[in-house]
Amino acid sequence: MLDIKQIRENPQLIQERLNSRNGTYDIQPILQLDKQQRELEATRSQIQARSNEIGKIVGQKIKSGINPQDPEIQALRDEGNAIKAQLSELEPREKELKAEIEQLILALPNLPSDSTPIGKGEEENVEVRLWGDEYLPQNPNIIPHWEIGEKLGILNFERAVKVAQSRFVNLIGAGAALERALINFMLKMQTAAGYIEVSPPLLVNTDSLTGTGQLPKFAEESFKCADDELWLIPTAEVPVTNLYRGEILAAENLPIYHCAYTPCFRREAGSYGRDMRGLIRLHQFNKVELVKVVHPSTSFDELEKLVGNAEAILQALKLPYRVINLCTGDLGFGATKTYDLEVWLPSSGKYREISSCSNCFDFQARRADIRFKEAGKKGTQFVHTLNGSGLAVGRTMAAILENYQQPDGTILIPEVLQPFLGREVL
């Protein structure tokens, strides 16, 4: 959530930075309502001051011995009653204006950082580095992961459609075991890196989704329970970040690192016709998420470390990947800066996103009201929050099924996963 004071004091800069994003955002309605609200507040303050003054005068006169029924006192009381009636009309309108302003600000995305490249879309993202050329598969006849998975009997999409609908999958036998091995391996790596594991609720309330920025803008992307004010989580970022909603943390307890494995649920309303086959874009998928709550002075350094934690998984699995600095036009709603990790999928000859690591600055902290206090100092500040996948499990499995695919149709198991699976080949 953007700061109304920042919008008010730097309207041109704010509008320019919003214009660099993909979308149309206009801060003028906010400025107009803010002007009305502040004028109303000033009027109310003046009237309230007069009401306080009248109360003081009446009290002094009665204390000095003047009869409470004296015409002068009665006139002051009449004026005071009229002011109270006026205030009772002004206060609801002021609250209404504040609520309107808040709703408009909630619809605005975060401001891109100075180190985020300017661009209109993904074609203008900037490649930061490539890793793993020596691990590019030499098999010239690699087939897509969904085909090899079905041939091996470890993936079944047809029966998942029968049970649910399209964009679901059944993992069977060694497929389910491989997924479980990946989850355990990822959690082991991240807890060793200092993250504290959390097993959070998979259903969250509206305030939680608003706090991390999914609501109100992306309601159509989420699954909502029909009879309850609860939503299935699109990512563990939501429940884990909201652990601290409405709290004031001690500065000495920062940074806070959490990792969480959860199923994630997304309607994929805007992706009709894309990635209809395979594990890339599902309504339900598993992911290990990394979340950081940090001091504002360290958040960009923490982002680099977060990316390194996600990269460590890919490097341990020896999966070729690249790191991309997303441009302003491709930046997520709540992020000020994002690095995407894209893994190599040889069947399509493309790198595909497997992790998105973002610094959200104080955007989520303002929405969720997460603050911290320095010992011995007055006042509080908003924390900075970061999140990233460490990693998306289904996409990691897809990358293994393709990059480790052998000419005879078998799949070698990455060495680091063999202790979890008790086998070397699928």
UniProtKB/Swiss-Prot annotation:
GO terms for molecular function: ATP binding; serine-tRNA ligase activity. It is found in: Cytoplasm. It is an enzyme of class 6 (ligase). ATP binds at residues 266-268, 353-356. One of its GO terms (biological process) is selenocysteine biosynthetic process. Pathway: Aminoacyl-tRNA biosynthesis; selenocysteinyl-tRNA(Sec) biosynthesis; L-seryl-tRNA(Sec) from L-serine and tRNA(Sec): step 1/1. Keywords: Aminoacyl-tRNA synthetase, ATP-binding, Cytoplasm, Ligase, Nucleotide-binding, Protein biosynthesis. Its EC number is 6.1.1.11. Its main location: cytoplasm. It holds the Pfam family Seryl_tRNA_N. InterPro entries: aa-tRNA-synt_IIb, aa-tRNA-synth_II, aa-tRNA-synth_II/BPL/LPL, Ser-tRNA-ligase_type_1, Ser-tRNA-synth_1_N, SerRS_1_N_sf, SerRS_core, tRNA-bd_arm. Catalyzes the attachment of serine to tRNA(Ser). Is also able to aminoacylate tRNA(Sec) with serine, to form the misacylated tRNA L-seryl-tRNA(Sec), which will be further converted into selenocysteinyl-tRNA(Sec). Homodimer. The tRNA molecule binds across the dimer. Belongs to the class-II aminoacyl-tRNA synthetase family. Type-1 seryl-tRNA synthetase subfamily. This is Serine--tRNA ligase. It comes from Nostoc sp. (strain PCC 7120 / SAG 25.82 / UTEX 2576). The gene is serS.
